[in-house]
């Protein structure tokens, strides 16, 4: 199957269960086409695929957070999904993932500080001295059905193509129609906040330096200073409406030639 055929297959595999279906259909067609015009053809993958791509690209991507690993984080293809973007040569050049959590009797602050957000079994798998401190005022209100977006990576030669404005929105929109979540969250490094990455992703509700990891397994020195970003379904729909109305899907055809 050609990569262009894969993109058509990806659209066919999208299961629209919740939300404004006609509106979401229009968004998905425009967004998937926008990625294809940039030489990136989308398909669904697995969390094993995501980890394999991460481990093969550590020169341009920090180690995958445990929340998006099957072991020890508990990520499964039944409670999450992975989107891969391939170039015409079939190489993975972009990734995106999402998980759903049932937090009807708990909240983000409790789950993160207990490390259950990061590990299936924190008592067994946490590093010695590993801890998480959450200071975001909204953290205790993030409960119910909560989707986590992340696992974002673009191969360096595919950056500056606005893929960060396209593929994460596809992931968030699919999470909404698949799970009908109450909130979608993401943790963003301070470096990416300084680059206004959160704004390009469409987040309006973000608290910098509000999730602090000590002795994290994700980074060599063990410390991470993260921003907590949150988006409600209504905020997502408003954001997607803006994308449909204002995002220019067209791009110089020479980019497709360079990416082939």
Give short role names for the model-derived ranges:
Residues 1-18, 100-121, 231-244:
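Contiguous N-terminal and early-domain "leader" segments and peripheral loops that mark the onset or edge
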Residues 7-29, 67-88, 210-220:
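Short N-terminal signal/transit or membrane-insertion segments
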Residues 85-89, 100-102, 151-158, 190, ...:
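Short, flexible loop/turn elements at secondary-structure junctions
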Residues 109-211, 215-220:
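Acyl-donor binding region in acyl/amide transferases
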């Amino acid at each position: 199957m050609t990569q262009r055929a894969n993109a058509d297959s990806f659209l066919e595999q999208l299961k629209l269960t919740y939300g404004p279906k006609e509106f979401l259909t229009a968004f998905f067609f425009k967004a998937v086409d926008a990625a294809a015009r940039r030489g990136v053809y989308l398909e669904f993958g697995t969390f094993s695929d995501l980890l394999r791509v991460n481990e093969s690209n550590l020169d341009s991507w920090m180690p995958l957070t445990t929340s998006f690993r099957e072991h020890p984080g508990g990520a499964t293809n039944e409670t999450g999904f992975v989107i891969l973007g391939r170039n015409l040569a079939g190489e993975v050049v972009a990734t995106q993932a999402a998980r759903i959590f049932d937090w009807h009797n708990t909240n983000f602050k409790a789950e993160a500080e207990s490390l259950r957000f990061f590990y299936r079994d924190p008592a067994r798998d946490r590093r010695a001295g590993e801890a998480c401190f959450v200071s975001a005022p909204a953290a205790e209100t993030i409960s119910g059905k909560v989707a986590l977006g992340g696992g974002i990576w673009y191969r360096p030669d595919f950056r500056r193509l606005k893929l960060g404005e396209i593929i994460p929105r596809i992931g968030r929109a699919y999470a909404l129609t698949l799970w009908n979540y109450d909130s979608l969250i993401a943790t963003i490094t301070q470096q990416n906040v300084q680059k206004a990455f959160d704004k390009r992703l469409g987040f309006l509700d973000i608290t910098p330096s509000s999730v602090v990891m000590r002795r994290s397994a994700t980074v060599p020195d063990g410390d991470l200073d993260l921003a907590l970003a949150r988006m409600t379904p209504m905020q997502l729909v408003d954001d997607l409406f803006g994308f449909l109305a204002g995002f220019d899907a067209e791009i110089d055809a020479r980019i497709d030639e360079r990416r082939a």
